[in-house]
Amino acid sequence: MRMLVSGRRVKKWQLIIQLFATCFLASLMFFWEPIDNHIVSHMKSYSYRYLINSYDFVNDTLSLKHTSAGPRYQYLINHKEKCQAQDVLLLLFVKTAPENYDRRSGIRRTWGNENYVRSQLNANIKTLFALGTPNPLEGEELQRKLAWEDQRYNDIIQQDFVDSFYNLTLKLLMQFSWANTYCPHAKFLMTADDDIFIHMPNLIEYLQSLEQIGVQDFWIGRVHRGAPPIRDKSSKYYVSYEMYQWPAYPDYTAGAAYVISGDVAAKVYEASQTLNSSLYIDDVFMGLCANKIGIVPQDHVFFSGEGKTPYHPCIYEKMMTSHGHLEDLQDLWKNATDPKVKTISKGFFGQIYCRLMKIILLCKISYVDTYPCRAAFI
């Protein structure tokens, strides 16, 4: 009798396991296409990474038959004198849209404030907001507002292409063209989004240390390695095979914020004049230009790429950038640059406390595109 009951229980569990396996396989089949597109495509593209980064055939397919001669677009607003006869540590370009006045105002009061950097950090930076023209539907009124804004602040450069996501590479070309023409002596160049936060005291201290050793061939940020082109036509990042035929991009840094040395800026500008700029994903185009001249990006754990950093003094101590800050920009600037932040990790117990807090905040199982877990141990 016991054997009969035991046999029934075994069959019952076998049935449950079979049902579970069937449901699992059915779910896997249903979701396989998006899983395959996301995971498998990354695995495939990463396997091509060495070839893409090491050989010239990628750039050969994108090279122009005739080198571009000068800018294709004219300046509507410009400040040729911005860098003249000055020792510039950092030329900072902020990618912005014509309508984003509030974002520009917040940056002027915080990390983009030249006077603050000069008086408090003993460094000379030049901040410029890079943009195109307003959408035609928004008319001349917004352009008049931009002209008024620039008369007040003298920190906008604008060319006569329409400002849109699909013209981001044109905006990048404008930045490198301006730097090459009007500020070739800047020690470093940085490009950043207008919803980014930059811990300027930490960044300036870092760049000054690099300047002292005469660093060259320098490009740093959050590095994307072996990233595949998006072939999904519903994505705004869609890239056709006609535009880019290879299974992986060269290594590049996230466009949210990255820094290059002045010599790299000059080389990238020259390379940009020889490549087809129809690829509108600007950070990828930057990677193609750098790949052409043999510059390899370096990953910095405190450049957050597209992610927003956790709010905590132990994080602020070494942070460089954090993405996605609008309403909280002023408060974050005040808290992160408070001199007391530098004292929180002093002493044995302070170091232990901050190490534990960073492990708790950064070493999570769920994927968050912010600082990696290894940043907790630096």
Swiss-Prot record:
Widely expressed. Highly expressed in lung, colon, placenta, testis, pituitary gland and cerebellum. Weakly expressed in brain, liver, spleen, lymph node and thymus. It catalyses: a beta-D-Gal-(1->4)-beta-D-Glc-(1<->1)-Cer(d18:1(4E)) + UDP-N-acetyl-alpha-D-glucosamine = a beta-D-GlcNAc-(1->3)-beta-D-Gal-(1->4)-beta-D-Glc-(1<->1)-Cer(d18:1(4E)) + UDP + H(+); a neolactoside nLc4Cer(d18:1(4E)) + UDP-N-acetyl-alpha-D-glucosamine = a neolactoside IV(3)-beta-GlcNAc-nLc4Cer(d18:1(4E)) + UDP + H(+). It is a single-pass type II membrane protein. Its main location: Golgi. It is found in: Golgi apparatus membrane. Residues 1-14 are cytoplasmic. Keywords: Developmental protein, Glycoprotein, Glycosyltransferase, Golgi apparatus, Lipid metabolism, Membrane, Signal-anchor, Transferase, Transmembrane, Transmembrane helix. Beta-1,3-N-acetylglucosaminyltransferase that plays a key role in the synthesis of lacto- or neolacto-series carbohydrate chains on glycolipids, notably by participating in biosynthesis of HNK-1 and Lewis X carbohydrate structures. Has strong activity toward lactosylceramide (LacCer) and neolactotetraosylceramide (nLc(4)Cer; paragloboside), resulting in the synthesis of Lc(3)Cer and neolactopentaosylceramide (nLc(5)Cer), respectively. Probably plays a central role in regulating neolacto-series glycolipid synthesis during embryonic development. This is Lactosylceramide 1,3-N-acetyl-beta-D-glucosaminyltransferase. It comes from Homo sapiens.
